[in-house]
Amino acid sequence: MTVWIQNPFDSLPSEGGRKQRYWLMAEAFLRAGHRVTYWTSDFSHSGKRRREAPPSVHDGMEVAMVPTAPYSGNVSMRRIASHRAYARSWTRMACERGDRPDLIVSSMPTISAASVAISLGRRLSARVVIDVQDAWPETFERLAPNPLRPIAGALLAPLRREAQRIYRAADMVTGVCDRYRDLTGRDDYFRAYLGIEAPRHRFFEDLRYGTGGRRLVYSGNLGRSYDLDTVVKAVKADESLELDVAGFGEFSSDCPRVRFHGMLPAERLQALLAECDIGVIPMRDDSWVGIPNKMFDYAAAGLRIVTSLGGEAAGLVAKYRCGATYRPGVATSLAAAVSACGGIGRDASLEMCRREFDAIKIYDDYVGFVTMP
């Protein structure tokens, strides 16, 4: 079977980070004996810079770079224009090819590229899987400027209708968490967590772990979805706490026990996580995120997990007794959650990672589902 996978956002392994969802998915299709073309943007969403093109054939898959207009802000008209230009470029490149796919897997977002996937599926007689990685346009409503909040729902209604049209038109709909099942309106929705590679678990066996202390770490995007102010406030109020922050974006603190490392390559991030004790997931209370990428990194490192997310994330933390939850935006609640982690060893998170987040099993099962006759 010839498979096309389309996603403009995930980092590529050649950019220094760990393998992310769609690369891991592509490898699973290759393991099952399928031919894979991986379509992605030539502009890095996380780094906001032009990408260096990897080899056109990489690890057995073809990598096709789609020309994309740059943008600097995650919430901006320039980004919307960039997404539309990406969708047009992908349409043109796909139609110029001599080969035809049997299956197209398209991430959602973006809405415009997912819509192209539906159209290409009809034109090329291919089945189409829409894979929901984030809630669009619902996330836009949450991030709308305060003056626009009262009318954001009405302004975004056309995008919401288009998203629902895409979900109905797809042959299959999959996603990264159970929460998105209701969003799609599909009873046949298939959930596949983002996951993380199992070999990463063993990396930490050879590194020094934090010794039952109270050294916190946050890794990931430093955008508006995350509430680091509350974490810093809790650290300032308790001299036994330290915080390491690693990620892309702007961050500063006048507290000497708060350290900012910037964006770290995979090995340096692994080493930092191994030195810390507790991974923090400080999501705002109106977030649509089910389980963020950082939870997989923390679990693979054996960190105790403190999260303000409810739903699936809180349920898994409770099931494996590997951390605690706190009230979003409340520093005293976060401090209490940190204290509640005192008697928890790293094996609890590692067990959760082995049972729930093993990427090999997740994506082999995914391939089995979407290729069923």
Task: Label every model-predicted segment.
Residues Y226, P265-L272, D277-A299, V306-L316:
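Nucleotide-sugar-dependent
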Residues P8, P13, T68-I80, D99, ...:
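Acceptor-binding helix/loop patch of EC 2.4 sugar-transfer enzymes
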Residues G213, D244-L273:
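Nucleotide-activated donor-binding/catalytic signature segment of Leloir-type glycosyltransferases, i.e.
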Residues M1-E62, M172, T230-D238, E242, ...:
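N-terminal subdomain of nucleotide-sugar transferases
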